[in-house]
Amino acid sequence: TGRSPIALPHFEGVEFDAFMTFNGSYCFTEDADIFSNPIPTEDVHMIIQNATALGRPLTVATKNRLASNGKDEDLIEYYSFAKQEIDVADDFEQVANEKVYQLMTGSSLAEHPALMKDVSHARITFWWNRAVDIIPTDGGKGRGIEKMLEYYHFDKSQAMAFGDGNNDIEMLKSVGHGVAMA
């Protein structure tokens, strides 16, 4: 999922052995981290600077926290898809210096180049045309799946994934049985 560990949905009667969150950047079990791939702090700060220049508030996401420096219509609606509300945090700058696994902001396709200007180790992924998730360049759902398969000693041919958006394509390619849902 692109969600944070604190925003995972609960399914009555279903227990999961492991979780792949932040579009594959943080994978874990109840007892152990499987894969931890935060965005370099200098890139986090550059993205914040670029978003500010565009007049776009954003959210930084750590393992335990989602902290925003403001909100706009696009970010509010993006959060609503996960039935969440934005936390405009007084300590945003402090949280931005922690291990940030993902940033979220409203953004049109035309804004993507300016948002990522001078950013070396992060990239955009998105499934909606009005907001983006920003993840490590060497991350993504495909990389998260690879790390999960390694951890459990499974071959790609033994894995199945379901996806419903553009940000799921690499995940579907990283398993033996990828199912694209409409």
Segments (PLM) and residue ranges:
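Active-site phosphate-binding/coordination module
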Residues: G2-D74
